[in-house]
Amino acid sequence: MRIAYLTGEYPRATDTFIQREVAGLRKLGVDVFTFSVRRPGEEQLVGEEQKAEATNTFYILPPNPMRMLGSHLSLLLRSPKRYLRSLKLAWSTRQPGLKGLAYQLFYFLEAGILAKQIQQQQIQHLHNHLATSSGTVAMLAAELGDFTFSFTLHGPYIFFEPYRWRLDEKIGRSRFVCCISHYCRSQGMVFAASEHWKRMHIIHCGIDPELFTPVSHQGKGHRLLFVGRLAAVKGLPILLESLAKLTPQYPDLELTVVGDGPDRAALEQQTADLGLTDRVKYVGYQSQTEVRQHLQQTDVFVMASFAEGVPVVLMEAMAAGVPVVATPIAGVSELVEHEVNGFLVPAGDAVSLSDRIGELIDDASLRSRFGTAGRAKVTQEFNIHHETARLHQLISRSLEGKENPVRPELNPSLEPAELLR
């Protein structure tokens, strides 16, 4: 089986779950060709894994004018009717105004380059992650090139503007849709015609638990960790407020912030205004190995998000046996069970957040209990080997025209060792 993977920017430091999924499918014998609309910046290539993937990925932008012209001319001559249908689809799914029309023209031109590459490499199917602009390119490329496509629906951003990104049309035209949680699937169902609900399936993002060594918890804790993009949806100002409330009682408390993003300067200023400069370290993007090292030196992982999918970094913390405090946003509660493997606090509530952090700092046995339960949850339900095997089964059966359950089953022909390798 030969399939293509498309994202807007690949590989990125924040999208390691896509790299794991690609690697898992390759281990199962699938020929996966990676495509990306844009080339990531050097700051995203933080590990050898990202650098290797970047070397083997086809980048649509910046376009070679002759390649773009040749691709579209070839597609037009091969099937004028299909080319015109694709133009009509691009027109009907454009965003409002002249700006929307201009962007749709760019997407159509990019789609032609992608479609021709997929045809030349005799690829059977195209799968897209993060179905906003790159999802539009995937949908148009599939129409231009006469092949099937699917996508993974994550959220939260596409649910802010579902009609702008024509989520309804993408679901309706896809062979299948992978939803990262039941919550995510329910939101897709809001915008999809009911006859298309059966093509929406649950495939979790996942991690390899064996890469994480469980942390040993003893005595009082004092080390907090956040990993993620420094953007408004992550609620970091609330985390900083909570830290300021806790410092009088816990004078040795410290927070490490791994990641970068548009809000970094504002967050650093807030840190200074709250008198926390000596307690908060901003270390930027880190490799997967470095993130695992940070987890080994952490007592509590905190994520105060306002909007989410199901954060992979929460899975990583739980796999390392680190107790988590998070908000019950979107699919988070399908991973974090309140008072079983972590604490869930209301979004935007700095007081509740600081109270729960304090409980975990004070109680090593509670940290240990949550850590053990968290690792078990991830191992059982968010194991990348199992999720990739489910995806492999979903792709195979869908391309054969067979129906699939909402939660695809593991292929019974695979030996346990193949699922866990």
Name each model-derived stretch.
Residues 171, 285-286, 293-298:
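Short alpha-helical donor nucleotide-sugar binding micro-motif in glycosyltransferases
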Residues 252, 279, 352, 359, ...:
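A short, well-ordered alpha-helix in the C-terminal region of glycosyltransferases
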Residues 306:
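Aromatic "clamp/platform" in nucleotide-sugar-dependent glycosyltransferases that forms part
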Residues 268-286:
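Nucleotide-activated donor-binding/catalytic signature segment of Leloir-type glycosyltransferases, i.e.
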Residues 338-339, 343-350, 359-364:
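Conserved acidic donor-binding segment of nucleotide-sugar-dependent glycosyltransferases
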Residues 16, 222, 226-250, 262-268, ...:
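A conserved mid-protein helix/loop that constitutes part of the nucleotide-sugar donor-binding site
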Residues 323-326, 336:
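Short hydrophobic beta-strand element within catalytic cores of glycosyltransferases
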Residues 183, 206:
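Carbohydrate-associated surface elements
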